């Protein structure tokens, strides 16, 4: 990264001291790029099984195409220019350099500007939100958003924690401090994957400051009510608060939930137990890293992509976008520290944590995308989220909606905020 001098940014009349505004030109290092190409050139490919698609993981035949594009066509300098499209900042919080993007609407006029923090997850990064940013910062019938997008410590340009125990509660505490430094007394939150847990924790910690919480991933809680609805739901859905769409997405339950999770959660067990072991190989091999990360962008976008030779990757994403995300992990060497976040949150029983036993009372909006890893009906979400003002069955999309379906996600965030603002 290339830093300017230390400076004070005026935000809402408040002077905020930062370590510096920076650009990403420092990522364009000829020696680093030469090293990347040398490592790519030394890749040892293996042959996939016949007609295996992505059922065994990233298909090696298609991987050769991706790697060839990466080596011969992908223009990292051009993508760094794209990264620099929005202003980047760093500030030190609790001893860690925390990276974030801060984008204000271009034309304020008479419009109401609502502060919004959006938080990514794994294997994503701040770059996930680049397509949705211009949609949220434009005027929507008098409403627009001033957007803050931080990188979770240990991801991308944020410094990695140096001590054990940095979990979602710690990240939530740091991001609350960030919004306070930026001068926002109240604000909206949006998140998916780890971002949904972090923003939920923020709403639990400071409900007085969180005007609204919007999630595109919601994990259900356990208990008798959930168990009973699983038993009765397929036959008498109205008795347990299920809609027809809930039934379609949930059942048969074992096939769509238990079996699917068994097929797709192997990575989770590794990262929640021994992240440094697997991460060591990924941090050393760019092609291994790309295969590991991009396989998730295939399967988590649509489960049927497992049956395709190319994993359906280019149906929703461009190789430039996918490889830019990979390069953020590669150039910052952050794959191991990002994987550790699983162990910090799942290394012990998450149901024993205080946040698992604490309700969420701020206005909440849920966008239920049909290809999300697990479907959470409104009746299940209400067990924890006590003030759901918006629940939308999204027509299409999976785990990465800001990158897959930015218009759909933006529209739902906007309508949710308008409901909360009573516009």
Predicted regions and their residues:
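The serine-hydrolase catalytic nucleophile loop
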Residues: 122-134
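Short beta-strand element of the alpha/beta-hydrolase
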Residues: 112-121
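Conserved hydrolase catalytic core segment
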Residues: 135-144, 182-241
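C-terminal subdomain of alpha/beta-hydrolase-fold enzymes, centered on the catalytic histidine
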Residues: 270-423
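Alpha/beta-hydrolase
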Residues: 20-21, 25, 31-34, 40, ...
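Glycine-rich "HGGG/HGxG" loop immediately N-terminal to the catalytic nucleophile
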Residues: 76-78, 127, 152-166, 200, ...
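Non-catalytic accessory segments flanking enzyme active sites
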Residues: 33-106, 111, 330-352
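Active-site loop/oxyanion-hole signature of alpha/beta-hydrolase fold enzymes
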Residues: 94, 148, 152-192, 220
């Amino acid at each position: 990264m290339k830093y300017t001098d230390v400076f004070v940014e005026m935000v809402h009349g408040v002077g905020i001291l930062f370590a510096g505004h920076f650009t990403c030109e420092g990522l364009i290092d000829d020696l680093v790029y030469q090293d990347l190409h040398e490592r790519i050139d030394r890749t040892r490919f293996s042959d996939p099984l016949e007609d295996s698609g992505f059922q065994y993981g990233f298909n090696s035949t298609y991987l050769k195409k991706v790697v060839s594009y990466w080596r011969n066509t992908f223009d990292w300098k051009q993508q760094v220019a794209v990264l620099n499209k929005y202003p980047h900042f760093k500030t030190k919080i609790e001893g860690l350099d925390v990276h974030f993007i801060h984008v204000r609407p271009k034309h304020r006029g008479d419009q109401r500007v609502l502060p919004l923090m959006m938080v990514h997850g794994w294997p994503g990064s701040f770059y996930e939100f680049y397509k949705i940013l211009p949609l949220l910062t434009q005027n929507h019938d008098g409403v627009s958003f001033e957007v803050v997008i931080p990188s979770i410590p240990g991801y991308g340009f944020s410094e990695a924690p140096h001590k054990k125990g940095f979990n979602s509660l710690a990240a939530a505490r740091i991001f609350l401090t960030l919004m306070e430094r930026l001068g926002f007394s109240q604000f909206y939150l949006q998140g998916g994957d780890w971002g949904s847990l972090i923003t939920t924790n923020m709403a639990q910690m400071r409900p007085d400051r969180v005007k609204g919480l919007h999630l595109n991933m919601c994990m259900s809680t356990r208990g008798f009510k959930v168990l009973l609805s699983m038993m009765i739901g397929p036959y008498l859905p109205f008795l347990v608060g299920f809609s027809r769409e809930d039934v379609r997405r949930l059942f048969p339950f074992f096939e769509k939930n238990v079996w699917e999770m068994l097929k797709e959660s192997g990575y989770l067990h590794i990262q929640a137990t021994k992240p440094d072991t697997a991460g060591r190989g990924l941090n050393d091999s760019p092609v291994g890293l790309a295969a590991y990360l991009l396989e998730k962008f295939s399967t988590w976008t649509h489960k049927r992509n497992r049956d395709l030779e190319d994993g359906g990757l280019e149906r929703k994403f461009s190789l430039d976008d996918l490889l830019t995300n990979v390069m953020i992990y590669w150039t910052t060497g952050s794959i191991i520290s990002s994987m550790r976040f699983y162990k910090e949150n799942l290394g012990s029983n998450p149901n024993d944590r205080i946040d698992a036993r604490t309700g969420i009372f701020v206005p909440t909006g849920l966008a239920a995308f049909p290809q999300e890893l697990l479907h959470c009906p409104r009746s299940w979400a209400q067990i924890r989220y006590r003030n759901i003002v918006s629940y939308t069955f999204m027509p299409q999309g999976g785990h990465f909606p800001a990158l897959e379906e930015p218009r759909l996600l933006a529209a739902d965030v906007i309508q949710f905020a308008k409901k909360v603002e009573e516009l």
